[in-house]
Amino acid sequence: MTRIQREEPLVVSLLDRLLDDEPGVSTEAAKGRVQVLRELKQSVRRDLEILLNTRTRCLAWPPGLKELKQSLVNYGLPDFTGADLGSAKSREQFCGIVQAVIRQHEPRFKSVRVQLLGGAEPLDRTLRFRIDALLRAEPAPEPVVFDSVLKPATGAFEVKGGADE
């Protein structure tokens, strides 16, 4: 006898459920799977941008406090303000750091890969990279792609994509 698989409903994060996009409306219509998935991707994009624009402390933790390295106290990227991202090797290392930080702090991803994208012009110092990930969703993981930019003048990251445009 075959077992009927019941599809688990997709649910956005608790924070997104508590935020009210339309405070003047007292009731909300039920959302379909496609709309919930789109909202989930948008919230992941927003949270990725926050993660990449957050800096961790510069100093190493005392040797006896190893757990802090894996905790939320260590949320964000190391400060790279003085880093030379001009060489291909340093850019690849930077992408590796970004990938490791996303893996550590974004549990909604099943897998993550960060790859460097070429610049539009030879003198353009903007660092462009793509985040390919599998978003945990039922019944099957959903592939998402985020095109990201590090603006050298401000040190700010901009993350685009993820949702069906």
Report the location of each language-model feature:
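Immediate N-terminus of the mature polypeptide
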Residues: 1-85, 136-165
